[in-house]
Each structure stands twice: as C-alpha cells, then as structure tokens.
C-alpha cells in the first residue's frame, strides 16, 4: 500500500511526490470515506496552494461532497470554520514550517482535531484501491465561498480580555497568519507593529520560529521598546515569542509559562505534552496543581489525549499549542492572545521566565535511510536498555529513558530520513557525556540495520 501521510499529514516537494493528481485523489478518497456531507477547505500562501486546492476540491465534488472554500486561511481559521459551519471535515493545503518548494495536505475532524493515523490509513487504502465514489450528474457537489474571520475575532474576544494596552510586534513570516493575527491583537486594544505581513509564497525568513529566524523580530522589539514579539510559521499553527528585552524565549520555557497560566485561568488539571518535552514543565506546573501526561509527537496525539482525559492545555516544545476551551486545532494566533493576557495579569515575560527551571538540552540528527529506521530502532532499544542506568522507560513514540536528573529520547523522524536524539541533564558536562554515548549507539545501530 502506498504511504502518503506522515506525522503531520502529507508533506512533500511540489510536483515531485505532491502533484495535482495526488491532491485530486485525496479529495476523491476523503469524499468516498465521508460518503457525502460538507468539507471546509483553506490554504496557506505558497505558490502551489491554488493549484493543489482546486485539484482537491474537484475530487471532493466528484464524490457528491459540498465544499466551503475559505480561500487563504491559516490552519487555526480552518479548524474554527469546521465547527462554525458544522462541516463533516476540513482540509488545509499547507506545509507549515517547511520551505517554499514544499506543500502538504492535512485533514481535520468535525471537532477540530487532525485525522488520526488510523483514519489516514483508510484514506490511503481508498486511494490505492481506486474505488472512488462517483456522484451522478445531478448529485455532484457544490462550492460556496465564505470568510469566517469576523466570527473568529468575535469568539476569541469572548474568551480573552485585557485591562491594559501593549505594544506588540508580529512577524507573520509572509504566511497565512498575516490575515488574522495582527487584527486579533489590534481588537484586543494593542498597538501592533507588523513584520513580513504581506502574504507571499516567497518567504523572507526561515518559517520555523527560532532564535536565528527571529533575529529581526528581536531587534525590532528592542528598538521599539515593545512589550512582546510574536511570530508564526507558514500556517500559524505555531507560535514563537520574543520577550520585552528582545530575547527569544525558548520553547520549553514558553510551554511551561503558558501551561501555568492556563492552570491559573481555568483551575487545576491535566496538561498534555509529548515525549520530547523536558522536566521544566513538570517542575513548574506541579505547585500550581498541574499533572503532566506525555504522548506521541504530533498535534493529533496531543489533541487525542486532551479529549480522552479532559485536559486543560496541550502543547509541544515546538511552539504548537492546543487550547481545548477554544478548539482542538493547534492555534498560534489564539495562543498569541493568551500570551498577552498572561502579560496583562502576571507581568513581563522576561521576569516570568526567571521562575522556570533551566536544564541543559542537546539535540542531534543522525542520517538514516527510511528503510532502516524500524530495524535500527529495535537495536537502539535493546542496546539502550543495556548501556544506560535508567529508572523509567517510555516507548510510546521512539524510546525515552529517564533517570533522576537526565533523560534521553531516541526517535525516528516522521518527515525526514534521520534519527533524532534529544536529551536533557542538570549539567552541561553530563549532557555532553550522554550525547557522546547516545550518538555512538545510534550510528552503530544504523550500520547494523
């Protein structure tokens, strides 16, 4: 069977693996799977977005499914529109933080949660079978256009409130967030300074929000004496934050801060994160009545655990946050509003960040052909159990071993031909010692696979 979906939908180089033909067949497969109904479709700013969107919509229509085309839309707006219009599914044409030559297809459930791997497997099986539903001439689906931005803003303002006004610099990265994120901040009463705010498929900066890609945002925050800088990737499902001193706030720190604020705002509860998240989150939220649950990497796994356990907040140490009181779609735009509310209630991020415990985190990528990943992971798991003196093992996504003052995660990438090593320790010396040992173990495992 063909494997089209990865850890975050389909994501490939356009007109190589991701073609209009594949987009057409995904539309046909989704329509066949649904057996009718209505699907919301939106896309980010990539140059290939219109081509792929039209092909996908054609596939949906051919099965008798109606389409609500919301045009250029960040992923959070697509998730919101699914619930707003009572649709049976949603599709975003996006490659999120990948470079311009990539695009992707991500499918969403009626509750705003991404399709699970099991659901994606069913779509793949339909594509491979070629057994698509074909509507009669008088039952072919219809398309209507819609613009849910005003409703999104109105609903967001019912949940988030500020007592004061702040200066906010927003770097939308030329992505789809530029049509919504600055406007939400303005509606909250803030003074907004926009960077890279014109929608374009020719991205000015690297789309993944990190210290390097947000150097201009950091300089602008400092020069304008702004209270905070907020950045998004291509579809604005992620958020990156620069504090009032012009410093990029590490993902682990922001994850801890916003989880703590959610506990203060909504009361004690469970916080869901992924196996690659460090100890800081546990240590920071425990005194606030928070309990950490870890799951597989990916927003769909986080959303699934939130729904199962009635969690109060979910997030990954990549700037992907899910606020279940709002939606089960990762939403960097609404997250930005919550960051401002946190500042309004608790004070500057530069001061709040001092309260979050700091550990030494190291990451490594080891080249590994996709065909070797499964066998290499078997060897890694076996050897890691023998080589490290650990107290706890978590194997829900890769292999994570923990001791009292360190942890290591061995995990194959779901989107690249690499093995990832992530580790954390209390001291730099210990972290380097662990990484040296871990890298040697992984390279030997790949050679033997």
Swiss-Prot record:
Which one GO biological process term can you cite for this protein? Answer: carbohydrate metabolic process
Instruction: Give the top-level enzyme category.
Output: isomerase
| E.C. code | 5.4.2.10
Q: How is it modified after translation?
A: Activated by phosphorylation.
The record ties this protein, via InterPro entries, to: A-D-PHexomutase_a/b/a-I, A-D-PHexomutase_a/b/a-I/II/III, A-D-PHexomutase_a/b/a-II, A-D-PHexomutase_a/b/a-III, A-D-PHexomutase_C, A-D-PHexomutase_C_sf, A-D-PHexomutase_CS, Alpha-D-phosphohexomutase_SF
Report residues binding Mg(2+): 96, 233, 235, 237
Q: What would be one Pfam family of this protein?
A: PGM_PMM_IV
Keyword tags: Isomerase, Magnesium, Metal-binding, Phosphoprotein
Q: Which domain of life is it from?
A: Archaea
- Give the note describing cofactor binding and stoichiometry: Binds 1 Mg(2+) ion per subunit.
Q: Which residues carry this modification: Phosphoserine?
A: 96
Per UniProt, what is one GO molecular function of this protein? magnesium ion binding
Q: Which reaction does it catalyse?
A: alpha-D-glucosamine 1-phosphate = D-glucosamine 6-phosphate
Active-site residues are 96
Q: Which protein family is named in the record?
A: Belongs to the phosphohexose mutase family.
Q: Which HAMAP family match?
A: GlmM_A (MF_01554_A)
- Its biological purpose: Catalyzes the conversion of glucosamine-6-phosphate to glucosamine-1-phosphate.
> What is this protein identified as?
Probable phosphoglucosamine mutase
Q: Give the species.
A: Thermococcus onnurineus (strain NA1)
- What is the name of the gene encoding this protein? glmM
